A protein has these predicted regions:
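Short, solvent-exposed loop/turn segments at secondary-structure junctions
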Residues: 23-27, 31, 113-114, 165-168, ...
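Conserved core of the PLP fold type I
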Residues: 46-198
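Conserved Walker B
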Residues: 82, 203-204
Length: 205
């Protein structure tokens, strides 16, 4: 999407194209800007907070805030822990490397952030896709189910990346009904204990 936008800018002119593909704010002259409140807070931090190394796992207060933001009042009863990574891309990279096997396939939808494929290739994995939407533009649980069945027939574990809410690039968010169906498929494969499924929910947006 970013490359296509840049091509459109070259073809039609920067004054006629708005680039909304990159997560950065530019002014009218194309220069990077920062939200004033964010800049004010960053500049007010003492040097030891701004420049010192944090613990490898992350600052305890930050980790607790992450769990509260992610789950709010719906924290699961099971094991729950947070780990800091070098940005959202770092979290995806760590998950691919640690929760899938070299040579195996990782599953996501056919509309996806291109970096997923790059991260899989760098880690020696293959990115496979299912059709995100059916003919009525609803979540395509049939395609999801078929692809999960096919991949788990050939491998013992499967990492599934689901980008929701506000899926990039479609903006789609899975409904509670969609989630129930996705989890039913995963539970069916995992109940025997011979297959392992890891769900990576990319909540970047």
């Amino acid at each position: 999407a970013s490359a296509a936008c840049n091509e459109a800018i070259q073809k039609y002119g920067a004054d006629k194209v708005t680039n909304g593909t990159i997560g950065a704010i530019m002014d009218d002259e194309g220069k990077l800007i920062c939200i004033p409140t964010v800049e004010k807070v960053l500049r007010s931090l003492p040097t030891n907070e701004l420049a010192a190394y944090a613990p490898i796992i992350g600052l305890p207060a930050y980790l607790e805030a992450v769990k509260n933001l992610t789950f709010a009042d719906n924290k699961p009863d099971g094991y729950l822990e947070a780990v800091a990574t070098a940005g959202g891309t770092g979290a995806i990279h760590n998950t691919i490397w640690n929760y899938s096997e070299i040579g195996d396939s990782v599953l996501t939808s056919d509309w996806y952030w291109g970096t997923y494929n790059v991260l899989c290739q760098e880690a020696g994995r293959k990115l496979e896709t299912y059709e995100l939407f059916d003919e009525n533009m609803n979540y395509n649980i049939e395609s999801f189910t078929d692809k999960v069945n096919t991949l788990l027939a050939d491998q013992d574990s499967l990492l599934i990346i689901i980008n929701t809410p506000a899926h990039n690039p479609t903006g789609y968010s899975l409904s509670e009904e969609d989630w129930d169906k996705v989890l039913d498929v995963c539970k069916e494969h995992a109940k025997g204990g011979n297959k392992k499924i890891t769900l990576l929910v990319d909540i970047a947006y």
